[in-house]
Amino acid sequence: HVIEVLDELGIRPVAISGASIGSIMGVAMASGMSGKEIRDYALNLAGNRTDVLRRMIQARSGSIRTLFSSENSFAQLDAVNILKTFLPEQMKGSFDELLIPTSISTTDYYGAKERVFESGDLLAAMAASASIPFVFQPIKYDDRYLVDGGIFNPVPYDHLHDKADIIIGVD
């Protein structure tokens, strides 16, 4: 909704920073998608349960049996595969392609500190930032295990202080 209001007001950010689902929304906006396009894509996808189930099975490593087995209660989903399967085609594939500079906040699980991406593997950064522990597998990156950026910094506006005069935070 916030992105749609910004669109209506003709406000285009000069920089974006996000954590967890906010990193995915931020990358969608930085890729040039409007708030309406993002909402329409999500509603269309959510409204088609058969397609969602098909995509979940497609994204799942292993068989359909392992997807629903009780022994799999702690086996987590692969966030990279989920994103590859569900992200709209309009979303860019690298930080260099983004129309707006973007920072993605993740949490270094064992280091108990924030890891911020502004370059490198965009898909891995989004996947790590949205990897809720025990739901999604941590993302191994540079020999570190990265999880949901919202754990350490849920609204990473502090990465925008030197990039923008006005900062809008959404929680």
Language model regions located:
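Patatin-like phospholipase
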Residues: 1-19, 27-171
